[in-house]
């Protein structure tokens, strides 16, 4: 019985062992398959990773090469320019491959040199040349305004229409004729201009565009604000008629200033019968410079040999001049109440001055020498009339827009003392240099802060032009944050080796045949 039980247990044990072996085998097979699968997956992943890495390396290498290429071709950014990416109105190219002065790179601006070696020279716009410049096209050299519609002033861009002019079809305010048949200086050809001669109706001033009417003049038929006329010569000009040469005011009633239009009445003068404010006598019997003959005017030489010299009025000396009275020589304004500027007409009160004392001058009082504005309340500019307050200044208590401090404790040039104006030197030795406003620096100046030296526009938000107020942002620029403003030098230091290297690399190629 015991043996039988033992055999049963042995059989059960063998059976269990067999089952266990089968399971282990299956597990082993499964594990093996899993391991194979895992190994295969891992190998695939590794392979893909290696491929990705290789591609990444290749891409990085290509990108690095591309960056190196870009960097090598990138602008060194030396010199003056407008904007770096979108070239501004004027400057030097920030791209060593496009040197020279220009306006915009793609659409050249109003003035500059061509940024394209194939279009050198000065110009306005490349396709539509601007108001002034040289032709960017070697086939259209010279100075001009616009190429198709020449602008206000320039040389013809067309070799067939040389010279200086305003507009080609409708000549502008001033220039030379673009038509070789109509040389000379003029304003507009058909329409009356504010300044310049016209062909049909000559303007206020210019040369005749008609060889038959040479010379300088104002209007031909209608007197203008300034210039000579043919029939009724204006205030000043040369005769447009060869028979009446010279400078003059009006022909029949000589104007304020000019030369006689009559060869028998040469010289500079004001009016012929009643000499004007200033000029030479048109009468050989009354030579010299003067104002009025009987009642000498504001300034001039006496028309009377017995009353020589420069003066204003004889009895009541005017604003400035020399005394017409040998007993009262010198330059002055008024004798008793000195005018705005002059020398004392009184030997006891020599020197230059204005009023007792006026806006500017030297003291007429030997006890108060020097240049100044007003004695009690110094004006906008001058030297102190008080030896205790020497120097140039604006106002003593509230310094004006420009001057030197009248206070030895606040020397230097400045605008206003408490709130420095647009331009000046600091009136405070602790804030030296040139600047705009002290607290909020203006459009241009030197930093009043030793920690922010240099020229700049605004300190916090640099304006259109200046030097960096920060030692880390050297050079000339427009705006500090974008750094590449409308005009300036790179805020980065130049990258040329030396001046010769700079000249060599930034030289403007000369067009062939020039």
From Swiss-Prot:
Cross-referenced InterPro entries: Collagen_Structural_Proteins
Cellular localisation: Secreted
Propeptide: 23-75, 93-97, 114-118, 135-139, 156-160, 177-181, 190-199, 208-212, 221-230, 239-243, 260-264, 281-284, 302-305, 323-326, 344-347, 356-366, 376-387, 405-408, 426-429, 447-450, 468-472, 490-514
UniProt feature, compositional bias: Basic and acidic residues: 23-53
Alphabetically ordered keywords of this record: Amidation, Cleavage on pair of basic residues, Neuropeptide, Repeat, Secreted, Signal
Keyword Transcription regulation set for record: no
Record keyword Repeat present: yes
Source organism phylogeny: Eukaryota, Metazoa, Cnidaria, Anthozoa, Hexacorallia
Protein name: LWamide neuropeptides
Main subcellular location: secreted
Protein's GO biological process: neuropeptide signaling pathway
Residues found modified as Tryptophan amide: 81, 90, 102, 111, 123, 132, 144, 153, 165, 174, 186, 205, 217, 236, 248, 257, 269, 278, 290, 299, 311, 320, 332, 341, 353, 372, 393, 402, 414, 423, 435, 444, 456, 465, 477, 487
Signal peptide segment: 1-22
